[in-house]
Curated annotation (Swiss-Prot):
Keywords linked to the UniProt accession: Chloroplast, Plastid, Ribonucleoprotein, Ribosomal protein, RNA-binding, rRNA-binding
The organism of origin for this protein: Phaseolus angularis (Azuki bean)
Gene3D superfamilies, sorted: 3.30.300.20, Ribosomal protein S3, C-terminal domain
Gene Ontology terms for molecular function: rRNA binding; structural constituent of ribosome
Name of the featured protein: Small ribosomal subunit protein uS3c
Assembly and interaction partners: Part of the 30S ribosomal subunit.
Locations listed in the record: Plastid, Chloroplast
Main location, first listed in the record: plastid
Amino acid sequence: MGQKINPLGFRLGTTQSHDSIWFAQPTKYSENIQEDKKIRDWIKNYIQKNRRISSGVEGIGEIKIQKRIDLIQVIIYMGFPKLLIEGKPQKIEELQTNMHKKLNCVNRKLNIAIVKVTNAYKHPNILAEFIAGQLKNRVSFRKAMKKAIELTEQAGTKGVQVQIAGRIDGKEIARVEWIREGRVPLQTIRAKIEYCCYTVRTIYGVLGIKVWIFSK
């Protein structure tokens, strides 16, 4: 059996960079990592609560965190920023003040910025959310996968692979289904591959979605 490494960790330092950038004493590492996890969870929960009900997608591509002694800079890359800020610019300020209180930043400022991702469906997280939404609405998994691949092709990618695992369509025995379009060279380190794994709760149980996108 082939042992599969995470495609993002495999390419760190070549085509991938870290999502969190900060320096700390070795004894403070665990605290900083926990703080990053809390920040990301709070942002996702806040956007889930405040998005428009009609849209089933949160649209978060990635959340980058940069820390200095006196500042925490959080950059949210969103495919559909209108879901959060349309007609409500005070929402970001509200999120900022709530997080500042929860983090207990006494001597540090917290700054949140939202950046729009061009070609949202080039990002695996947004694509996985789209597939999850389709599966929750009981759309056939094959239809959902084909539609997802169409969307990535329109966004101008070189290749995409989608995998769904679990009790697909409510079958009693769990199985794995996958589909690939174009090239996805996982062994080539210099290939820019975006990857994400996403879990979705359906009425039949939990399904795991994995998406690989080869952009350049």
